[in-house]
Amino acid sequence: MNFLGKKVLVVGAGKSGISAIELLSQEGAQTILYDANEEINKEEISKKLPIDYKGDIILGGLSSELKSELDVVVLSPGVPTDLDYVKELKSAEIPIIGEVELAYNFSKGKIAAITGTNGKTSTTTLVGEIMKTYYKSVFVVGNIGVPYTQMVKNTENDSVTVAEMSSFQLETIETFRPDVSAILNITPDHLNRHHTMEAYIEAKVNITKNQTKEDTCILNYEDSYLRTVSGRIPATILWFSSVRELERGLFLRENHIIYRDDEKECVVCDVNELQIIGKHNYENVMAAVGIAIALKVPMDFIREAVTKFRGVEHRIEYVTTKRGVKYYNDSKGTNPDASIQAIKAMQTKTLLIGGGYDKDSDYDDWIKAFDDKVTYLVLLGQTREKIANAAKRLGVKNIVLVDSLSEAVDFCAEHAGVGETVLLSPCCASWGMFKDYEERGMLFKEYVHALKDE
């Protein structure tokens, strides 16, 4: 798509929107930055835009006159596609694309795209580390924090772009075709945005829609949703499993990660060599290895990278030990499945800090996963009473409601015994109390480090 001289409305004044404006301005488009939130500070937005930006910034409503003049609309990932004004733009037959589709117009080299309800950031980061051991030009972008549009003009024909893709980003792709895609797992999440599980699954599977048999899709064999949809995925599928041996793919045998194809079988590594804990992390490693194999990285390079990988911040991140109590930060555990994995990874009695913004999740499976491991459930945020009621119904005894994260940390520090663990794994989004899960995790670590050692 040629944007020279085109009038383009970029919707969303966040990081993705600003980055899209920069790229489109470089391509000679007439850009307009729009956000429905009238309370945003225009001056603050202006500071983030290119110095030579000459386009308008519009907040609140869109005039009919402007709508009639638009050639293209670029939606930021955080903007739901079912908003009234977005529907009006669609009905006017104005082409609407997302930030990923915009970036893809300019992307060179190979692309590995990773999605899934949980494990995206860890897997994307690990794939990036593996690629950097073998390829000279590697870019790690997407939902991981760096907009695809920000880096895409730096890509060359010999580059590898590793992109973390959320369901929000995948809703608006049209021609995006990764050489390798991966869907790590699908469990209920973001139903406040997608409304139905079927719509959420479709958004995830969208990552494969333009692939062909020449491309590869990495899938988790133990995910029933993925087994169900696999028949209509056009790419060549490479499965992984943490439960059973596969005729072809990646799997666990005792403590070893094994790769088997039509010709041979080889040991990738012993899981005891890994610096990350939990079965879910072994699955992330298998997915990353599958992507690397599909992109022709030699096994020696893969093995070196996976055994050095220390994980990502805010995902079952060891913080410190205070007075014989270990503290773990799993602020990225924003849904039941992610938080279940965090609890399973704990080796001792655990004081669990949970609660936050309500994404219409059901918490029963999360609570049932406590078994006898969770000694105190400390709850905060919008969902604290909803979770507390579910926990009481399921027989959880020690439930404590607090008003702040600092209060939660202080309570746990006072009640945790030597050899026990304090885990922040909220099972909820951070919105309302914190800017994002990163701020929540950073504050948790700050409060923990401020605790007295004696």
Swiss-Prot record:
Localization of this protein: Cytoplasm
Binding site for ATP: 116-122
Any GO BP: cell division
One function term, GO molecular function aspect: ATP binding
EC primary class: ligase
Disulphide bond pairs: none
Record has Transcription regulation as a keyword: no
Main location: cytoplasm
Pathway the protein acts in: Cell wall biogenesis; peptidoglycan biosynthesis
Entry keyword set: ATP-binding, Cell cycle, Cell division, Cell shape, Cell wall biogenesis/degradation, Cytoplasm, Ligase, Nucleotide-binding, Peptidoglycan synthesis
Coiled-coil annotated residue ranges, if any: none
UniProt-listed Pfam families: Mur_ligase_C (PF02875), Mur_ligase_M (PF08245), MurD-like_N (PF21799)
EC number in record: 6.3.2.9
CC per GO annotation: cytoplasm
The keyword Manganese belongs to this UniProt entry's keyword annotation: no
InterPro entries, per database record: Mur-like_cat_sf, Mur_ligase_C, Mur_ligase_C_dom_sf, Mur_ligase_cen, MurD
Job description of the protein: Cell wall formation. Catalyzes the addition of glutamate to the nucleotide precursor UDP-N-acetylmuramoyl-L-alanine (UMA).
UniProt family annotation: Belongs to the MurCDEF family.
PANTHER family per UniProt: UDP-N-ACETYLMURAMOYLALANINE--D-GLUTAMATE LIGASE
Protein name (Swiss-Prot/TrEMBL): UDP-N-acetylmuramoylalanine--D-glutamate ligase
Gene source species: Lachnoclostridium phytofermentans (strain ATCC 700394 / DSM 18823 / ISDg)
This protein's encoding gene: murD
